[in-house]
Structure formats: structure tokens, C-alpha cells
Amino acid sequence: SAASDVYKRQIQNIHKGDNIKQKYEELEDKAELILHKMERPVSLSKDRFTPVKTEVTSNLTKEQYEANVKKAKEYIKDGDIFQVVLSQRFEVETDVDPFDVYRCLRTLNPSPYLYFFDFIDYQVVGASPEKLVSVLNGIVATKPIAGTVPRGKTKEEDDMLVRQLVNDPKERAEHTMLVDLGRNDVGKVSKFGTVEVKNFMTVEKYSKVTHLVSDVQGELRDDENPINALMSVLPAGTLSGAPKVRAMEIIDELENKKRGVYGGTVGYLGFDGNIDTCIAIRTVVFKDGKGYVQAGAGIVNDSVPEKEFMETKNKALAVVNAVKEAARL
């Protein structure tokens, strides 16, 4: 097992032969100390209030992305697929400390899954809202997110956008389709008759966008294990499409850059057999003085190319803003 110290960028390995109780108490004390330091007020520099000019470019122009959407809709009309998730990759030149971006991101875009990895020659920072799959005490769960609108500038506008989202036939149909895909994925490793949908199509709000979310659960079969549960769901339908294989072939055709970590998974597997993983979205990869943020939108027959383009920009905005904010620290 391991305990991570993201401030010092260290992982302390805890071996089965160690005094587990003593190690646990030591780590509790260390966590209390870190919390105490985090609660202390700090002074802000004047630079914190100076606008930072950060040029953001994409691997696709607006016209190219919208052309991809139109091509995907042709595949849908031909019966190849029902839905496909098309993304674009945003790029920003920066010398910012990636860990400072992590610090800003967890404040600007609080999410269920927060992570920072330093692989020496590149770093991965993320704040993902979406569970890929978990197995906790024998319960397999996935949490598809499908259906997105930007946050409003006022409460009234925010409420109006939520009403539009929950009553939009296109968004509801897309969400239902991906929930069905999630049920199929969970069902591959679950006991017969145990798969159910909980909290169907609920609203979750984040800093820049509002999503429609559902919970899909089942009881893990006795002859299955958490790794098989992970493999049954990966890649997520909400990042690929339906049917998955054909959707991924179309993604490979239309997207001009490999996705890398985007759409993959980040998580843990414990000695107790539990696993908890998220989808690598709202994530930035730092390498060679550049930050890369990828975001996608689900394309269906009713999709409007310009709206799908704007959805990808809105999804990337929280991460891009964290990079800009970190430059002021």
C-alpha cells in the first residue's frame, strides 16, 4: 500500500511487514499538520491581480471541428453508430509550476476526483467529475455523465439553462442511450437481475458547466474481480460513443491527434479488493513548456455543430483558467 504526499511530491510505501497501526497513526499526524498549514492565511502578491495573457490555440479550427461533426452525423444517418464523442485539444505555452495548477484547479473546479502526477518529463493534473467504475464491498458502479450546458452568469440565467437542459429531447435521448450502455457494461460482471439505475438523470453543477448524471449499479459476480469490472467499462461510452468499437474507429479517422491520457482512467486498487476510478477529463498534461487540455462533445443526429464546438470550449475552460490563475502565484 502507499500514502501520497502531493505537496512534497513523494509516495511513502507501506509494506505488509510494517507495523500498520503505527504507520497509520504517523500518517494521521502528518495529515493533521498539513491541514493546519492549509488553514493558515497567506499574503497575496500584487501580481495576483494583474491580468495574465495566455494564448490558447487548438489542434482544430472551428470550421474543422464543425466539419467533423457533420461527417459524424453522416455516419449516424447511415446507421454506423448512434452517437460518437468528438474532441479537440487545446494548447497553451506556459512555464507555470504544474503543482500550482493543481492547487488552483481544486479550488476553481472542486470535483470528486482530484489528482496530480509527476512523471519527471511530463506532469498530469486533473479534476474529474465522472466516475468510470468502482467496486466497493461487492457493488459495481458507474456514473455516466451526458448532457451539458454552461453555467449562467446569474442565478436566474443558471436556473433557465438547467430547465432547458432537463427538458431538451436531444440531451435526454443521448443520456438515456449512454445509461443503457452503462447498464450493459456493468451487467457483464454483475449477478443476474441485480443491475439497476439509481438517481436517474439528476443535475450536477460544476464551476463552468452543468451536467445530467445517473448512477448504474450491480452486484459483482463471485467469479469476477475488480480488474475485470474495469475492463468491462473501459473505454467509457461517454468518451467514445455507441456502439463503442465503430465509434472509436470514427474517432481515429476524424481526430488528427492521439488522445493520450484523455478519456483514459485514473484511480486506485486496494488490498481489500476495492477499486475506484474516474475518467481522465478536465485534465491538463504539461510537457516541454506547454499545457494540453482536451475536451469533447457527444454527437447525435440532432447535434448542431456550432453548439458542440462551444460545449468543448466550455468544458476546457475551468482547466485553462486554472493555468492562468497559477501563473499569478
Could you tell me what each predicted segment is?
Residues 1-4, 8-329:
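Extended alpha-helical targeting/anchoring segments
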